[in-house]
Structure formats: C-alpha cells, structure tokens
Design a protein with these regions (language model features):
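Residues within the alpha-helical elements of helix-turn-helix
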Residues: 38, 53, 71
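Short alpha-helical elements of helix-turn-helix
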Residues: 2-6, 26-37, 62
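Residues within helix-turn-helix
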Residues: 47-48, 59, 66, 86
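N-terminal leader segment of winged-helix/HTH proteins
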Residues: 1-26
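Charged, amphipathic alpha-helical coiled-coil/dimerization segments
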Residues: 16, 66-129, 136
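Short, locally clustered residues in the helix-turn-helix/winged-helix DNA-binding domain
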Residues: 9-12, 37-41, 102, 129
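Short capping segments at the starts of secondary-structure elements
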Residues: 42-46
Length: 137
C-alpha cells in the first residue's frame, strides 16, 4: 500500500494533467486558470499575493500575469497606496474565459470523483481539510 502523501501527489499531478488537457484548446494552463479564479474571488490582488496563493515563485507569477495581460484577460493598474505595486483584475474577456474554463474543470472534477457517492465526496473533502489543518497548526 502506497503512503497517503504519495497518493495525494499522484492525484494532484493527474488532476493537473487532466485540467491542462481539458483547457488546452482555450490556451489556458492550470496555473493560469487558478489566477483567473483568484482574481474573480479577490479583484485587485498584487502579483506577490497571487504568487503566494498559487504556490509559485514571484518570477513564475510575473510570467503568468504577463501572458494573461498580453492575451487581454486581465487589466492592471497602479496600487492606490503604493504607486509601485500593480493591482490586477479580470477583464470582461477574462471573465468569459473563466466561465468556459470552469465548465471544463468541473467536468474533470466530476470524472475524478465519479466513483464516489455524494456523501463520500463530502467526507473526502472534510478529511483532506483535516489533513491541511493538522499540517498548518
């Protein structure tokens, strides 16, 4: 029997690959999708905040933001208190793209969880959250 941590890593990698495959024709990667989602939840986040939230380096986040900006999916403006930092928001095109991506990611997640009942899905989420809470205590 494989250790739980290993199974979690394989599940995460498999999910990432399935998400990338599902969104490939939209030109969106899983990290770009995550950034679009974060900006939908919390408009105006800085690049540093996005990097922390996405578990990537600031350099990687700068590349993600650059690519999304070049594609017209986000809008950037100087931070009101610090003229140096830039706040980032979804553009209307970014919102439309996020909706399309969410449909595909939801389908991937449904496939991933298709062998579980609704109660088992809830239990899995609760157990994983318990693991996260234990490690962050």
């Amino acid at each position: 029997m494989e250790p739980v941590g290993y199974v979690l890593k394989v599940a995460q990698q498999s999910l990432r690959l399935a998400m990338d495959t599902a969104m490939r024709d939209l030109g969106v990667t899983a990290p770009q999708y995550a950034v679009l989602g974060f900006l939908d939840e919390s408009p105006g986040m800085s690049g540093a905040d996005l990097a922390r939230r996405a578990f990537v380096t600031p350099q990687t986040m700068n590349r993600i933001i650059f690519n999304l900006d070049e594609a017209g999916m986000i809008e950037r403006a100087p931070h009101a208190k610090s003229g140096r930092a830039l706040n980032t928001r979804l553009s209307p095109a970014g919102r439309r793209l996020l909706r399309r991506c969410r449909e595909r990611v939801d389908a991937v997640e449904n496939t991933m969880l298709s062998g579980l009942t609704a109660a088992e899905r809830e239990q899995l989420r609760d157990l994983l959250q318990c693991c996260v809470d234990s490690l962050q205590a």
